[in-house]
Amino acid sequence: MSRYRGPRFKKIRRLGALPGLTSKRPRAGSDLRNQSRSGKKSQYRIRLEEKQKLRFHYGLTERQLLKYVRIAGKAKGSTGQVLLQLLEMRLDNILFRLGMASTIPQARQLVNHRHILVNGCIVDIPSYRCKPRDIITARDDQKSRAMIQNYFDSSPHEEVPKHLTLHPFQYKGLVNQIIDSKWIGLKINELLVVEYYSRQT
């Protein structure tokens, strides 16, 4: 299944706020109206919607998300927590959380078009897994810095999570540590996502 490129507002009306996909938010009460129209949700649908939230927020294909779930399942610790850490440490998401892009699709475009350096080297893979002590910067050219400055100017100034440090005048971000679950910028029950996939096998 390919990455979603359809109407974004349609998704947030059904699933709630997805800040990685769009800065728009559903109207207050729209979630309650949707529930009343469709009646009581089945357990399967609840698990499916949590999975879809994760997929659309991070801009993943179905195959990519399944791959992350399998990697998380083989790691030590809670599968759900490891899954969120893997997704949060993607380069496109780090750029978004630093405020160097307004959405994750915009961050992915910056990476694909070779505007971003990690530790002084161009990285053009949005799924690149960042590590503590990584230094993320814009390329030292006018176009790259102008694009990021535009995002700084147009985006709402969200607080940068504690595992990151932003130096906006240098167009630079630092990864201080692996993210803690309380800094995740999405309202999600990751255990339901893991349960969804465990029931598919």
UniProtKB/Swiss-Prot annotation:
GO biological process terms held by the UniProt record: ribosomal small subunit biogenesis; translation
Sequence segments annotated as region (Disordered): 20-44
Subcellular location: Plastid, Chloroplast
Residue intervals of the S4 RNA-binding domain: 89-169
Gene Ontology cellular-component annotations: chloroplast; small ribosomal subunit
GO MF annotation: an example: structural constituent of ribosome
Domain of life: Eukaryota
Main subcellular location: plastid
Keywords in alphabetical order: Chloroplast, Plastid, Ribonucleoprotein, Ribosomal protein, RNA-binding, rRNA-binding
Protein family (similarity comment): Belongs to the universal ribosomal protein uS4 family.
Subunit structure: Part of the 30S ribosomal subunit. Contacts protein S5. The interaction surface between S4 and S5 is involved in control of translational fidelity.
HAMAP family tied to this protein: Ribosomal_uS4_B
Function: One of the primary rRNA binding proteins, it binds directly to 16S rRNA where it nucleates assembly of the body of the 30S subunit.
Name of the protein in its database record: Small ribosomal subunit protein uS4c
